[in-house]
């Protein structure tokens, strides 16, 4: 198992009436194919159909009878411009856009034994959690439940975890104590390249459309 600090990524939460219908105008993917607890990889488009960024969209289900919620994980280099673009497009449609990682951290556990380790830390059976599935988990010794998704950018199995800064430090140390290997950006880039995963700014940009990028 390797662990990555990916706190430079952006994480936004969209809330409002029919958030999928509103966000659908900016993405080529059919967001209605995913339901609560599921997610999909997609690309964020500009007004010409060029790719502004790639991202993962998580369906967090209904807040109440009239409102739903989505979580978006966007790339670090594009986070500010993505956030401004999404707000510009979503707020007139009545959605609120909140940066939910502002005071938190995002960690990735990756490798063939990563999910087994997460299962030990949570005390829950995660064997039924599919790729791109997500749920809240209470991990041993942490103060708050953790947004946990079976996603990653390495081509390996594993999970990405969103948690507050204090819990993030505790979890990082606990993982070190268990012998988990800390990994950096270079290792992550090599792994994603071996898995043929796109890198925004290198394999595609705002002048590339999804067809040209093979997406």
Stretches with model-predicted labels:
Residues 1-215:
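Basic, glycine/lysine-rich polyanion-binding surfaces/domains
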């Amino acid at each position: 198992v390797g662990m990555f600090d990916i706190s430079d990524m952006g994480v936004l939460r969209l809330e409002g009436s029919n958030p999928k219908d509103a966000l659908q105008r900016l993405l080529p993917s059919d967001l209605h194919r995913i339901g609560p607890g599921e997610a999909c990889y997609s690309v964020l488009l500009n007004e010409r159909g060029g790719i502004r960024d790639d991202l993962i969209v998580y369906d967090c289900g209904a807040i109440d009878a009239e409102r739903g919620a989505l979580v978006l994980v966007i790339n670090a280099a594009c986070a500010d411009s993505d956030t401004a673009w999404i707000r510009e497009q979503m707020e007139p449609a009545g959605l609120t856009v909140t940066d939910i990682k502002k005071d938190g951290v995002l960690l990735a556990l990756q490798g063939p034994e990563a999910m087994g380790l997460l299962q030990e830390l949570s005390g829950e059976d995660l064997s039924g959690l599919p790729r791109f599935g997500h749920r809240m988990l209470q991990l041993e010794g942490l103060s708050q439940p953790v947004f946990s998704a079976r996603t990653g950018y390495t081509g390996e199995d594993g999970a990405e975890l969103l948690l507050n800064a204090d819990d993030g430090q505790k979890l990082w140390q606990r993982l070190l104590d268990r012998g988990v290997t800390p990994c950096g950006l270079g290792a992550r880039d090599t792994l994603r390249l071996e898995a043929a995963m796109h890198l925004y700014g290198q394999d595609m940009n705002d002048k590339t459309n999804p067809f040209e990028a093979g997406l």
